[in-house]
């Protein structure tokens, strides 16, 4: 998609992405990854962190996500998708967005995802590793970001 390519290039991220398809790109941030795409008239950045909410610890987990949302101050927020995935995401209208703004949005999602995935795994997923996104991806080559 030309608009996304142009934004990534002007934001200095073009050499750090792996194209998933015409509408989606992936970037790696430490142990987390961010999927970026244009959906309709919006640009979204999503870091899929967990396949499911931790069994037996739901109330404490939800509280922790809300606390993390408050800490991030609106830069990004946790959500639970209809398929059960726990994601960290941010988005805004495409109109008027420039590459630097996109890079800032992606970096916010990436850095917070990299910070919080390890904390949440340690607190909630040590006995449920199958619910994390920490699978063997040795066959996938994804450029590192700062």
Task: Please state what every model-predicted region is.
Residues 1-33, 71-73, 79-81, 146:
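Charge-rich, low-complexity N-terminal segments
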Residues 26-52:
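Short N-terminal mixed-charge amphipathic segments
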Residues 27-33, 80-106:
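Amphipathic, soluble alpha/beta structural segments
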Residues 37, 55-57, 98:
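Short acidic, gly/pro-rich beta-turn/loop elements at beta-sheet edges
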Residues 46-89:
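Short, internal acidic amphipathic alpha-helical interface segments
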Residues 62-71, 92-125:
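Ampiphathic alpha-helical segments that act as solvent-exposed interaction surfaces
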Residues 120-146:
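Short, highly charged C-terminal tails/helix-capping segments
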């Amino acid at each position: 998609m030309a608009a996304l390519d142009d934004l990534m290039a002007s934001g200095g991220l073009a050499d750090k992405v792996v194209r998933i398809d015409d509408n989606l790109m992936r970037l790696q941030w430490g142990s987390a990854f961010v999927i970026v795409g244009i959906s309709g008239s919006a640009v979204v950045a999503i870091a899929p962190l967990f396949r499911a909410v931790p069994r037996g610890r739901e109330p404490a987990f939800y509280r922790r996500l809300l606390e993390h949302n408050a800490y991030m101050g609106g830069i990004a927020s946790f959500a639970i998708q209809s398929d059960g995935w726990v994601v960290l995401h941010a988005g805004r209208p495409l109109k008027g967005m420039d590459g630097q703004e996109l890079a800032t949005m992606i970096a916010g999602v990436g850095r917070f995802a990299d910070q919080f995935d390890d904390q949440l795994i340690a607190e909630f997923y040590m006995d449920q590793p199958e619910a994390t996104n920490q699978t063997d991806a040795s066959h996938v080559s994804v450029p590192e970001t700062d």
